[in-house]
């Protein structure tokens, strides 16, 4: 019996939840956000079903820019793995992205997920970026002096940051991409201006970064610094947590360079390697 792929519907959310609860050691998030995804423009959620029309696979594709698509949230019911659903959903998502103007489709995989890496390479993807997902709790040491701390920056600061970053090894390692949480697309000068307007663009003698706050801490999407200045920037990032309530944590997506991982680990960050794969359409 062959499975078919169709667009997801609101009633599929409750049917997907039981077999996605143990995807990771901490659970899963897809059933909590899938309902919202169904209503997002430029986004498609698909499911795999058999004759009973009960979802046993799911995936999402979305346009992050007019020419860039991102594929994520691929899940297959444990009893239906190795059935070809993963590759079939990927192909379906890629076709949808191409029809909607995308010229490249990308996705992220943790470096130690050999099965997923093998699958995307067989599908024609190539490795286009190595990143570090870095997390840390609030610093317990001395707070930085006023002149060393991160503070909100303005348009002039963003201009300097962009000029510096565009010529840096961080930009080269990032392939000029910016993190949108667990999604990536090509960065633009406008991203920094948006951050200035949202009061999420910060500067210090150690460099510049975009840091967004939520109920659990701070998330860093983009940063610009140099090897000698990186320690001060990272210290300043942890220092920002002192102004957050509860027991906040900081998470940062940082391109892998010859020095970036060491700078993070020296300041107590736990680092998980992430790889970005892309497919030209």
Language model: regions and residue ranges:
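Conserved acetyl-CoA-binding loop-helix of GNAT-fold acetyltransferases
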Residues: 76, 82-95, 118, 122, ...
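Conserved beta-strand in the GNAT
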Residues: 54-62, 70, 75, 203-213, ...
């Amino acid at each position: 019996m062959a499975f078919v792929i169709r667009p997801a519907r609101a009633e599929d959310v409750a049917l997907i939840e039981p077999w996605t609860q143990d995807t990771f050691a901490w659970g899963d998030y897809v059933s909590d956000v899938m309902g919202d995804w169904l209503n997002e423009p430029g986004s498609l959620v698909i499911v795999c079903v058999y004759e009973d029309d009960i979802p046993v696979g799911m995936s999402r594709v979305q346009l992050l820019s007019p020419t860039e698509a991102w594929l994520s949230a691929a899940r297959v019911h444990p009893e239906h793995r190795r059935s070809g659903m993963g590759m079939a959903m990927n192909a379906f998502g890629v076709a949808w992205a191409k029809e909607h103007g995308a010229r490249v489709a990308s996705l992220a995989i943790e470096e130690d997920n050999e099965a997923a890496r093998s699958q995307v390479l067989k599908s024609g993807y190539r490795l286009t970026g190595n990143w570090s997902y870095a997390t840390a709790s609030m610093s317990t040491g001395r707070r930085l002096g006023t002149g060393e701390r991160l503070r909100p920056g303005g348009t002039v600061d963003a201009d300097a940051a962009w000029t510096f970053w565009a010529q840096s090894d961080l930009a080269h390692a990032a392939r000029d991409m910016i993190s949108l949480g667990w999604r990536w697309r090509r960065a633009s000068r406008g991203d920094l201006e948006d951050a200035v307007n949202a009061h999420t663009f910060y500067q210090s003698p150690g460099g510049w970064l975009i840091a967004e706050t939520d109920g659990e801490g701070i998330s860093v999407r983009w940063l610009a610094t140099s090897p000698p200045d990186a320690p001060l920037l990272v210290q300043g990032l942890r220092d920002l947590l002192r102004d957050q309530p509860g027991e906040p944590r900081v998470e940062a997506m940082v391109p892998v360079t010859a020095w970036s991982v060491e700078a993070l680990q020296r300041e107590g960050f736990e680092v998980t390697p992430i790889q970005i794969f892309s497919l030209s359409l």
